[in-house]
Amino acid sequence: MATINLSLLPKTLTPNSKTLAPLLSILSTSSLSFLPCTRPHPIKSRSAAYPTVRALTDGEYSSRRNNNNNNSGEERETIMLPGCDYNHWLIVMEFPKDPAPTREQMIDTYLNTLATVLGSMEEAKKNMYAFSTTTYTGFQCTVTEETSEKFKGLPGVLWVLPDSYIDVKNKDYGGDKYVNGEIIPCQYPTYQPKQSRSSKYKSKAYVRQRDGPPAEQRRPKQEATPESST
């Protein structure tokens, strides 16, 4: 995955309280202190089904650290999203496109990457709680903020992001669930349009018109005979 959709608001962001212009100027530089971002969507966006907000904070920035680089003297706000506890992390990875890996190969890569950081495959299977090979290419794991730094620089690792809820009500981080080696596919909601009441009534009216009136109403009236008229 070479590109990332950064269409949503930041997950953990310390924006200027007066204007967003400094943020835009920072994003245009090559050296970034923080980046607003969302789960990458190289194939399709899931933001339509799950309105969520995410952001990237690198190893030099977090909401819990003092902002020593703020030379403006202006007070800055901290925005924390539900589920963002710096113990749940999203590791976004990129894969070659030609040939593209299979789903199984991508899952193996996720586990091997996590095992490299945690020291064993057993620990990797215990700490990976979700992943995706479609809406984004990456996995989610429970590690400390300090341990999350170890992912940086590993082969294929593109982003290391604090994870946050996609479904706040159910405290769901999204993705296909991974529980001790068992994969539970994510059930994405589907849109089913409701049938219009007016169209239903129109359909019934059409049937009545097509069938016509009852037989006794269709009988022609008998013409009056000369005898009856006299």
From Swiss-Prot:
Is Ion transport one of the keywords?
A: no
* InterPro entries reported in the protein's UniProt record: MORF/ORRM1/DAG-like (IPR039206), MORF/ORRM1/DAG-like_MORF (IPR054059), S8pro/Inhibitor_I9_sf (IPR037045)
- What is one Pfam family matched by this protein? MORF_dom
Q: Which domain of life is it from?
A: Eukaryota
Q: Which UniProt keywords apply?
A: Chloroplast, Plastid, Transit peptide
The record's annotation in Gene3D superfamilies points to: Peptidase S8 propeptide/proteinase inhibitor I9
Q: State whether keyword Membrane applies.
A: no
The principal localisation class reads plastid
**UniProt miscellaneous comment:** Expression detected in the dark, but enhanced by light.
What this protein is called in its record is DAG protein, chloroplastic
Source species of the chain:
Antirrhinum majus (Garden snapdragon)
Which gene is this protein's source? DAG
